[in-house]
């Protein structure tokens, strides 16, 4: 799977641009503020309906326009697909796939799976369990067709239960929702657990390449003690939850734990080693998608030279190219990337003040 055409309109400082990337590695270079990262961000927006740099989508719309427009032609082994997206400053979003309106943004993620490695990617290890749950759930969503609905149902039930808690409702009023929560929580947790088990098989090998002398343990925690009956736990914690006004245990508290010995990885590893660990997680997730669904992710790698030394930059690019996936890499100095490759990039683009030029 690869993008054969990308059209970008009124996205940050890119007024209008059209790219025809190749399979394999596409190198995008330019000075800071030129717009090279905005190209990666636009591709991500097409796959997720949001930015990886800002939670406020209005900020990515060019100041001279009231909407952004994105289009991509996606070529897969068994189908060609055209994706169009328009986001208005008012917040309204329109998505079409092959000319048909799409109601759920999750359809974008299903159609265009994307892996991102940026300077901000390390939030996966430092910003608490939410980012790691999102990482697990991205994979669970792709690996099991039943996950999305179970996840949606869990969120709805939690919202209802928390509202009742804030209203100081009796346990008799909450008991029905507890039964529903237990049912959906078990579905979500089982799929998450199976996914992490499968991911671990691939992850160990990749971590062994990046960090060969370090034993890193990766485990899934469900959000409550696995030896405790969840229904009984909810009843036992009712008074505490009532005082807090929210549900203290459950699948919304799940986490992916990464440890070196008895220490969390973020305390035991250097910044450079943590960068490599995040890269390993992203590559493993993409490889597992390929293994399970015979579908490649598209990799977006921003500002690679500043993130890794030459040796590990070369190793990362080697592992990425071996996946057979389409890759977009940005850099200020293109030579830093070219020197790390065993063969030239498949295509190069230069970006200056939002203008994109292909380098023949």
Curated annotation (Swiss-Prot):
Keyword DNA damage attributed: yes
Subcellular compartments: Cytoplasm
A single GO cellular-component term on record: cytoplasm
GO MF terms, alphabetically ordered: ATP binding; single-stranded DNA binding
Matches recorded under InterPro entries: DNA-binding_RecF, DNA-binding_RecF_CS, P-loop_NTPase, RecF/RecN/SMC_N, RecF_2
PROSITE patterns associated with the record: RECF_1, RECF_2
Pfam families the record matches: SMC_N
Protein's GO biological process: DNA replication; DNA synthesis involved in DNA repair; double-strand break repair; SOS response
Keywords: ATP-binding, Cytoplasm, DNA damage, DNA repair, DNA replication, DNA-binding, Nucleotide-binding, SOS response
Keyword Nucleus: no
Residue numbers binding ATP: 30-37
Similarity field: Belongs to the RecF family.
HAMAP family the UniProt entry points to: RecF (MF_00365)
Role: The RecF protein is involved in DNA metabolism; it is required for DNA replication and normal SOS inducibility. RecF binds preferentially to single-stranded, linear DNA. It also seems to bind ATP.
Protein name: DNA replication and repair protein RecF
Name of the gene encoding the protein in the UniProt record: recF
């Amino acid at each position: 799977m690869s993008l054969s055409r990308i059209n970008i309109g009124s996205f940050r400082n890119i007024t209008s641009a059209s790219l025809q990337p190749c399979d394999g590695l596409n190198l995008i270079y330019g000075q800071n503020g030129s717009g090279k990262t905005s190209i990666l961000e636009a591709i991500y927006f097409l796959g997720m309906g949001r930015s990886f740099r800002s939670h406020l989508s209005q900020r990515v719309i060019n100041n001279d326009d009231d909407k952004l427009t994105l289009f991509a032609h996606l070529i897969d082994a068994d189908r060609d697909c055209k994706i169009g997206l328009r986001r208005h400053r008012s917040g309204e979003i329109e998505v079409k796939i092959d000319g048909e309106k799409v109601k759920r943004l999750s359809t974008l993620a299903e159609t265009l799976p994307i892996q991102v490695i940026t300077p901000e990617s390390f939030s996966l290890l430092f910003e608490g369990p939410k980012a790691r749950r999102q990482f697990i759930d991205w994979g669970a969503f792709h690996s099991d067709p039943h996950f999305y609905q179970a996840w949606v149902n869990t969120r709805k039930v939690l919202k209802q239960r928390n509202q009742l808690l804030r209203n100081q409702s009796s346990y008799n009023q909450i008991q029905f929702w507890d039964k529903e929560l237990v049912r959906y929580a078990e579905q979500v947790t089982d799929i998450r657990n199976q996914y992490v088990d499968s991911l671990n098989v691939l992850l160990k090998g990749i971590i062994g390449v990046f960090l060969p002398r370090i034993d890193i343990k990766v485990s899934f925690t469900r959000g409550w003690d696995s030896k405790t009956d969840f229904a009984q736990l909810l009843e036992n914690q009712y008074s505490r939850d009532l005082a807090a006004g929210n549900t203290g245990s459950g699948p919304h508290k799940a986490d992916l734990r990464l440890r070196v010995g008895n220490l969390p990885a973020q305390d035991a590893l250097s910044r450079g080693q943590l960068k490599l660990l995040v890269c390993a997680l992203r590559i493993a997730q993409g490889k597992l998608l390929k293994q399970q669904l015979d579908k490649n992710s598209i990799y977006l790698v921003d500002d690679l030279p500043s993130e890794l030394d030459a040796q590990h930059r070369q190793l990362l690019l080697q592992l990425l190219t071996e996946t057979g996936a389409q890759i977009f890499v940005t850099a200020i100095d293109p030579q830093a990337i070219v020197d790390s490759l065993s063969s030239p990039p498949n295509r190069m683009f230069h970006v200056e003040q939002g203008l994109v030029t292909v380098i023949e």
